[in-house]
């Protein structure tokens, strides 16, 4: 995750801003600079290579002292920065909202996946600039639309019905922030269309998840899609979701956290996010993740979670 201000800077033209991507030499100069504390939140002028991000975002970049940041000296960084600028330049961003726009925290891996989709001749985003723009605006939080199947970050499709598409996510070969853990497995479920869904199609998805992915928890980050994650990673997701939610509340970002369909979401996660939305502390909310919940009535007749041991899915073992 990183703020949009880590990729580009605003240049005032008439009454609105044009956004320009950073080059990696300007960022390198900023990373070596000694800057007064009062100037940490200001864009840095490298003198030679142009404008660089505010020094307060140093930890967002991979350096000898910080391996957890993004690899900004890659071609992919430039591609992602240009993708962001193209999207922002399609909007009218004024003095009144430029700060809120650039402080928006976005998913670096999601944006890299959009670049990968854009460069794939078999993908619809390769052929449609309008769809690419729409997908990018959703990814950077500048659209009220949710991420649906056609605007999704992409991945390998492992399940699809009339209402849902399930993607296997892999970041092993990413350039900006690869996940090098060979055991990493995560999935995302997107709605094919943002409209009411019949119980039949919900039941098909729930059956698939309980049958094939019973070693995973179904959660949401509040953005209109489902995530299927290992139970061992749930606490980490909770920390991230809570931090993002609080950050958005603090900065005044419109954050209508979408709890999604309670019949699909893991019961403990639904309790966690509902309590978070009520303004409770992280400790209070996370306690619900490890609490034994009273089993809910099965909303789908004939659909059981009871399986013989030899029938249990091996996905995620």
Swiss-Prot record:
Annotated GO biological process: viral genome replication
Enzyme Commission (EC) number:
3.6.4.-
Q: Which residues form the active site?
A: 225 (for ntpase and rtpase activities)
Chain positions covered by the region annotation RNA-binding: 205-241
Give UniProt keywords alphabetically.
ATP-binding, Host cytoplasm, Hydrolase, Magnesium, Metal-binding, Nucleotide-binding, RNA-binding
Q: What is its main location?
A: host cell
Query: Which Pfam family is an annotated match for this chain, by its short name?
Result: Rota_NS35_C
The residue ranges crossing the membrane are none
Keyword field contains ATP-binding: yes
Q: Where is the protein localized?
A: Host cytoplasm
Q: Which GO terms describe its cellular component?
A: host cell cytoplasm
UniProt GO MF annotations: ATP binding; metal ion binding; nucleoside diphosphate kinase activity; ribonucleoside triphosphate phosphatase activity; RNA binding
Superkingdom classification of source:
Viruses
According to its UniProt record, which cofactors does this protein need? Answer: Mg(2+)
UniProt keyword annotation of Magnesium present: yes
The record's InterPro entries line, in alphabetical order, gives: Rota_NS35_C, Rota_NS35_N, Rotavirus_NSP2, Rotavirus_NSP2_C, Rotavirus_NSP2_N
Q: Where does ATP bind?
A: 107-109, 188, 221-223, 227
The record's function comment reads: Participates in replication and packaging of the viral genome. Plays a crucial role, together with NSP5, in the formation of virus factories (viroplasms), which are large inclusions in the host cytoplasm where replication intermediates are assembled and viral RNA replication takes place. Displays ssRNA binding, NTPase, RNA triphosphatase (RTPase) and ATP-independent helix-unwinding activities. The unwinding activity may prepare and organize plus-strand RNAs for packaging and replication by removing interfering secondary structures.
Record note on quaternary structure: Homooctamer. Interacts with VP1; this interaction is weak. Interacts with NSP5; this interaction leads to up-regulation of NSP5 phosphorylation and formation of viral factories. Interacts with host DCP1A, DCP1B, DDX6, EDC4 and EIF2S1/eIF2-alpha; these interactions are probably part of the sequestration of some host SGs and PBs proteins in viral factories.
Q: Which HAMAP family has this protein been placed in? A: ROTA_NSP2 (MF_04089)
* UniProt family annotation: Belongs to the rotavirus NSP2 family.
Report the protein name in the record: Non-structural protein 2
Q: Which organism is it from?
A: Rotavirus A (strain RVA/SA11-Patton/G3P[X]) (RV-A)
């Amino acid at each position: 995750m990183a703020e949009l201000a880590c990729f580009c800077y605003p240049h005032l033209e008439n009454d609105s801003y044009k956004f320009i991507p950073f080059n990696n030499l300007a960022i390198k100069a900023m990373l070596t600079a000694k800057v007064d504390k009062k100037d940490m939140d200001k864009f840095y002028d490298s003198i030679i290579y142009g404008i660089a991000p505010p020094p307060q975002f140093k930890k967002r970049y991979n350096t000898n002292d910080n391996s957890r940041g993004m690899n900004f000296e890659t071609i992919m960084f430039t591609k992602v920065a240009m993708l962001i600028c193209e999207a922002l330049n399609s909007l009218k961003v004024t003095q009144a909202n430029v700060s809120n726009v650039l402080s928006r925290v976005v998913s670096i891996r999601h944006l890299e996946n959009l670049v990968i989709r854009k460069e794939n001749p078999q993908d619809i985003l390769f052929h449609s600039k309008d769809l690419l723009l729409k997908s990018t605006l959703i990814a950077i939080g500048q659209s009220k639309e949710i991420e649906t199947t056609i605007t999704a970050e992409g991945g390998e499709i492992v399940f699809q019905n009339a209402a849902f598409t399930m993607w296997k996510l892999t970041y092993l070969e990413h350039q900006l922030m690869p996940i090098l853990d060979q055991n990493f497995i995560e999935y995302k479920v997107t709605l094919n269309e943002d409209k009411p869904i019949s119980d039949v199609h919900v039941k098909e998805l729930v059956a698939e998840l309980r049958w094939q992915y019973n070693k995973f928890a179904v959660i949401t980050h509040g953005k209109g899609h489902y995530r299927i994650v290992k139970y061992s990673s749930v606490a980490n997701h909770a920390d991230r979701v809570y931090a993002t939610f609080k950050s958005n509340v603090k900065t005044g970002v419109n954050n209508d956290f979408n709890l999604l369909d309670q019949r699909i979401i893991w019961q403990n996660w639904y309790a966690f996010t509902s309590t978070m939305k009520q303004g409770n502390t992280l400790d209070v909310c996370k306690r619900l993740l490890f609490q034994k919940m009273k089993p809910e009535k099965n909303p789908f007749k004939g659909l059981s979670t009871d399986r013989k041991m030899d029938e249990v899915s091996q996905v995620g073992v």
